[in-house]
Amino acid sequence: MKRTKLTKMPPLRKASPQTPPGFHLLVKPSGAACNLDCKYCFFLSKEMLYPGSNIRMTDEMLRIYIRQSLDSQQTSEISINWQGGEPTLMGLNFFRRSVDYVEKFKSPGQPVLYTIQTNGTKIDKDWAAFLKQHNFLELEYGWTKGIS
């Protein structure tokens, strides 16, 4: 399969009348990769779909995703929801860049809500400060005795 590098983003269209007034997108920047092996996880075997690969959201794709997400919303409030696998495996700098792109591409005064679903194992003082600074409204985490 031939891959084309996206060096320039295509011009964006205004949202059409058929576009729903608002929607939530779930972003899985690390794909199925996770640092735990919870038996209950429905996503557990998905990493095996691409054996030997390291599928991750590139910085270029992050920039395109953020811009198109912000431009396509018809509501004043935008929601960006990070999931995985384990999204924190992308590293704190990835999320710093995502917030930078949001600030660059959002409309003036446009509120953006962030959530992240994580197992919490990578959350340290730096992560906690970042999440607090950028008002991540939800920090969902969970594991059970079934972790192996």
Specify the residue positions occupied by each region the protein language model found.
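Flexible, acidic/Gly-rich N-terminal and inter-domain linker regions that tether
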Residues: M1-H24, L36-Y40, Q68
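Short, motif-level signal for alpha-helix interfacial/capping segments enriched in acidic residues
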Residues: L12-A15, M57-Y65
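Canonical Radical SAM [4Fe-4S] cluster-binding loop centered on the CxxxCxxC motif
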Residues: T19-E60
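Short, charged low-complexity linear motifs
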Residues: L25-K28, L62-S72
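Short glycine-centered, acidic/aromatic-flanked micro-motifs in structured strand/loop junctions
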Residues: P29, G84-G85, T118
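Conserved, mostly hydrophobic/aromatic
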Residues: C34, C38, W82, I116
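Conserved non-cysteine loop/helix-boundary elements of the Radical SAM core domain that shape
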Residues: K46-M61, G85-F94, K122, S148
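Radical SAM/AdoMet-radical enzyme domain recognition
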Residues: I66-R67, D71-N81, M90-S148
